[in-house]
Regions:
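Active-site-lining helix/loop region of Rossmann-like oxidoreductase modules
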Residues: 38-46, 50-53, 63, 198, ...
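NAD(P)H-binding glycine-rich loop region in Rossmannoid oxidoreductase-like domains
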Residues: 44, 52, 58, 64, ...
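Glycine-/Pro-rich loop/turn segments that contact NAD(P) or position catalytic residues
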Residues: 134-241
Length: 290
């Protein structure tokens, strides 16, 4: 916004004494100037806020995954700069919007230790989003390498870079045993490949004790199709069924960066067609810190 200079004629003290009309005129003009200043100030504040957000760089681990890719896209759409941490840089260039100047693609493997991850995160990242996940197979240690030790490595890398905001994409039912859900088919299936949910829960516990400002997001069953309902958000160890679009999971992760109400919380999310639409301020605000 171009600033406009307005010349204001201020009555002299002598004239003020001679005329009460001048006094009233001056008061009215002064009030007008104050109103103008407030309007200008609010717009400037908005612009500065938007510019500041545009400069924030978010590191996304697992950026080429089905959920991670959506997180990257939504962060860019919101005006954030993104550093996409990927294992295969060449693949990422074809998968992600590599032509976007706000996107930087870097090699980052969470299984290779915190030192290399710290180098990838760098000094310019203000927050880290962990959207990693192992590929099901016969390596029963894979969930622990990625979902447990890999997440721990990321947290330690954040410490080394003084990054104090961490968003983790986890899963409902990670604490299924304590919830009495040992016989839940979803709990059994998700633990078939190396006790995946147990590995995720151990990583969650590490994050909580680390002192970092965290938001742990536990989505229900992940769908690739567009959203068909509104987000339902509940406290930890509440939901044991339900599904949600990956687009909505990505949205929750991005919004968690914007709302202080999301700090130091574990939230569980699904979507339901009959659920009322609520703001993220209300959704995060409805969950108590543990």
């Amino acid at each position: 916004m171009a600033a406009t200079l307005t010349t204001v004629r201020i009555p002299t003290f002598h004239n003020l004494r001679r005329s009460r009309t001048h006094q009233r005129s001056l008061n009215e003009h002064f009030i007008s100037l104050l109103t103008f200043a407030k309007m200008e100030g609010s717009e400037i504040t908005e612009q500065v806020g938007e510019d500041s957000r545009a400069k924030k760089k978010i590191f996304v681990a697992g950026a080429t995954g089905s959920t991670g890719k959506r997180i990257v896209e939504q962060l860019l759409a919101k005006g954030f700069a993104v550093k996409a941490g990927v294992r295969d840089v060449d693949k990422a260039r074809t998968t992600l919007s590599s032509a976007d100047p706000s996107l930087q693609i870097v090699k980052a493997d969470v299984t290779e230790g915190s030192d290399k991850l710290a180098q990838a995160i760098g000094d310019d990242s203000e927050a880290v989003v962990c959207a990693t996940g192992f590929r099901p197979g016969w390596d029963l240690l894979a969930p622990w390498k990625v979902d447990n030790f890999g997440t721990v490595n990321l947290v330690e890398a954040c410490r080394k870079r003084n990054v104090n905001r961490f968003i983790l994409i986890s899963s409902i039912l990670v604490n299924g045993a304590a919830m009495g859900q040992l016989l839940n088919p979803a709990y059994i299936f998700l633990n078939v490949f190396g006790l995946t949910l147990v590995a995720k829960l151990q990583a969650e516990n590490y994050i909580r004790k680390s002192g970092i400002n965290y938001t742990i997001i536990r989505p229900g069953g992940l769908r690739n199709d567009p959203p068909t309902g509104n987000v339902v958000m509940e406290p930890e160890d509440t939901l044991y069924e339900g599904s949600i679009s990956r687009d909505q999971v990505a949205e929750v992760a991005v919004e968690a960066l914007a709302y202080p109400e999301a700090s130091y919380k574990v939230v569980e999310i699904v979507s339901r067609p009959d659920a009322p639409k609520r703001s993220y301020h209300d959704l995060f605000g409805s969950i108590r810190q543990r």
